[in-house]
Design a protein with these regions (language model features):
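N-terminal first-folded block
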Residues: 4-39
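Structural signal for conserved beta-strand scaffold positions within catalytic alpha/beta enzyme cores
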Residues: 20, 64, 82-84
Length: 106
């Protein structure tokens, strides 16, 4: 994962503007709380489908990105299959960096 993106994600963590795993699914239906979701490339197909379907339904941007271990390392956890950013500005920056290809991911 590229350093700029890691720093932006860490900023979201410090600002407590994030959600993990199943919390993402329940938070989606509560208005505009989630702005961007990073789904691990090595998450199970069933998990990817569940997240993608729900996020598409609620028109929330998502990206298949990184691995479960890399996402988990940012939070000092083992593995995380999905990481959501709640802050619009941070989400916009992360999405822009990923779409520009400014990373060494998958």
């Amino acid at each position: 994962m590229q350093e700029k993106i890691k720093n932006m994600i860490r900023f979201a963590i410090r600002a407590r503007q994030y959600a993990l795993g199943e919390t993402i699914i329940s938070t989606c239906s509560k208005g505009n709380a989630i702005k961007l979701v990073l789904i691990a490339s090595d998450a199970s197909e069933a998990s990817k489908k569940k997240y993608c379907d729900k996020l598409t339904y609620y028109k929330i941007n998502y990206v298949i990105y990184s691995t479960k271990n890399e996402l988990g390392d940012l939070l000092n956890k083992n593995e995380i299959s999905a990481f959501a950013i709640k802050d619009a500005n941070i989400a916009k920056q992360v999405y822009k960096l990923i779409k520009e290809g400014d990373w060494y991911g998958i």
